[in-house]
Amino acid sequence: PPPVHQTFETGAFVVCSFCPRLYDYHPKSIPAPYNHSNIDSDEVLYYVDGDFMSRTGIGPGYISLHPAGIPHGPHPGTYEASIGKKGTEELAVMIDTFKPLQVTENALKIDDGKYYKSWLEQN
């Protein structure tokens, strides 16, 4: 997990908080989001409010799941959108678990079925 966002830790999971903040900033910098994989943890994000730097097409109340080992981020266009930005107003909570999560029947009912396509370039 990204340690700069980590707020709580147990032997089974960590909780990360994405809060409004300034980026590491320099006038000639581009605070670009980055690709990553959670090699040894499943990641669940709950989006509370604001614009998430690495994502597009989400809103308050959205939940995403990235199983261990699956590369993700950033969405197409987010590099370009980061140019000139000095901060973010994002608000989200992330849990990274060190054992695989099991998707419940209730979670399957709210799956939009197209999340995996959101990482592809739109033509």
Residue ranges and their predicted role:
Residues P1-A32, N106-Q122:
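Anionic coordination/interaction segments
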Residues E9-R21, S29-I63, P67-P71:
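Glycine- and acidic-residue-biased ligand/ion/polar-headgroup-sensing regions
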Residues R55-N123:
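TerminUS-proximal long segments
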